[in-house]
A protein has these predicted regions:
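A generic secondary-structure micro-motif detector
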Residues: 2, 52, 170-171
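Sec-dependent signal peptide recognition
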Residues: 2-8
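C-terminal motif of bacterial Sec signal peptides marking the signal peptidase cleavage site
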Residues: 12-15
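Bacterial signal peptide processing site
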Residues: 17-19
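Alpha-helical cap/lid subdomain in secreted, periplasmic
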Residues: 91-237
Length: 237
């Protein structure tokens, strides 16, 4: 009986270790086991990739690019919806049930709909600061693993040019919201990427705009990735 219990214990240990290995990746170059990284993307239509294929959206292109550069990343978890403002993103995160302290990378891009609806900049600042703290909580309190992206200028798109709104006014308002999110991001000690100038290239390059004439194309998102990926690599490697 005692001998049988020893054998059973050994089998259980081996089974557990086998299960653990399934959730890891073996790096043959260093002969070590590497845990894949978990990535959470928070935002609005610019995060889900409205009007482009899922593999073309910003989170998936970023994950693929980082994988090519040596990181191993699980498929991104995206909490975002077209039209969301800061307050709606906060509610969406709460309703999503996504657990805190489980992510190695968090990106945040939010605010265009606050600007589009003419909402208060003071309210935006308050809610954006709250979202920054939520993002920090998701990364096990590792501030260097939070990456904030500036709001692109939708006024530079064909839809923006034909919307009946003055594109110059749109640009000034977008810049004002970006001043706020940059100030709060840097004050919190987080990473900030300014992709807004690249978004304005859509004025002369329509391949940067999706078929709906408003949202970024996969090519535009690739440009954002080129801006953000080096920051992620520097902070995670």
């Amino acid at each position: 009986m005692r001998y049988s219990m020893v054998i059973l214990s050994l089998l259980l240990i081996l089974a557990c270790k086998k299960g653990e290995v399934k959730s890891m990746v073996n790096d043959s170059t260093t002969n070590t086991v590497v845990n894949p990284l978990n990535y959470l993307a928070l935002g609005d239509s610019y995060t889900i990739g409205e009007s482009v294929e899922r593999y073309e959206n910003f989170p998936n292109q970023l994950a693929n690019d980082l994988t090519k550069k040596g990181l191993i990343i699980n498929s991104p978890i995206i909490v975002a919806r077209t039209g969301w403002t800061t307050s709606e993103l906060k509610s969406g995160i709460k309703d999503s049930g996504v657990p805190e302290h489980k992510f190695d990378i968090v990106t945040l891009l939010i605010g265009v709909n606050n600007q589009y609806r003419g909402e208060s900049k003071d309210v935006y600042r308050k809610e954006f600061k709250e979202l920054l703290q939520i993002a920090i909580n998701f990364t096990k309190d590792k501030k260097s693993h939070v990456f904030v992206i500036s709001i692109p200028d939708w006024g530079a798109t064909p839809h923006g040019q034909q919307s009946g709104r003055d594109p110059q006014v749109i640009a000034k308002e977008i810049d004002a919201f970006n001043v706020i999110n940059k100030e709060e991001t840097l004050a919190a000690g987080l990473n900030y990427s300014n992709i807004t100038p690249f978004s304005r290239l859509a004025l002369s390059d329509k391949t940067l705009v999706a078929g709906d004439g408003l949202h970024p194309s996969g090519k535009m998102y690739a440009g954002w990735v080129a801006n953000v990926a080096p920051l992620v690599l520097t902070n995670l490697k």
